[in-house]
């Protein structure tokens, strides 16, 4: 746990306890991935959890997880020291043999808060983004509960499927970047480098790398996104973000 900032330890420990208490013997393993175990958590980084279970969850179990996680996850617009929790559950047997897109059993994320308040319970679904997530998590993760390394539970994921998932995800991203400018710009930068190198690179590093090879106008906006990601308050209202989003998307399509 020493690689993860100490002020997040209590959140991580509470998530771990919630999963053990309510999933019981169905729980195979809990793993952290993303910036928390790669380049280090940034001011606005999520805590990313991948949870592997052996059997489907009931709606009641999912509802309990939502009720228990909500109080310990940062809310959008909140100024507390909590971090956003993003938690994905998969069924191990549904990963073997591998098929793209994979099945997602459950998802918790703060962008779903309004739906949770209306009684929404995430159902099993195919999720193209999950291919990217699993590819990233398998390459680098930290086991916080369970007897198996994640690499033992997941099959090999062809990079051709990662490329397909990136192209699928980019289309949705460029249609929904408003009010999420920083994340959208840097995610596109990371997609570009992933397509080029086969590696999932931290967003700030990806942003700096793509900025270096971008025209000045777009370079400046990308570097603004990096500064925002690192904690600076950036006002996007007067920036022509759509121009840089389109530039990055066109660059991605050429790879």
Curated annotation (Swiss-Prot):
GO molecular function list? ATP binding; nucleotidyltransferase activity
Q: Which InterPro entries match?
A: AadA_C, NT_sf, Polymerase_NTP_transf_dom
Question: Which sequence ranges form a coiled-coil region, renumbered to this chain?
Answer: none
Top-level taxonomic group: Bacteria
Nucleotidyltransferase is among the record's keywords: yes
Its GO biological process annotations read: response to antibiotic
Q: Which Pfam families does the UniProt entry name for this protein?
A: AadA_C, NTP_transf_2
Presence of the UniProt keyword Nucleotide-binding in the record = yes
List the signal peptide residues: none
Q: Which UniProt keywords apply?
A: Antibiotic resistance, ATP-binding, Nucleotide-binding, Nucleotidyltransferase, Plasmid, Transferase
**What is catalyzed by this enzyme?**
spectinomycin + ATP = 9-O-adenylylspectinomycin + diphosphate
The record describes the protein's role as: Mediates bacterial resistance to the antibiotic spectinomycin but not streptomycin.
Question: What is the name attached to this protein's record?
Answer: Spectinomycin 9-adenylyltransferase
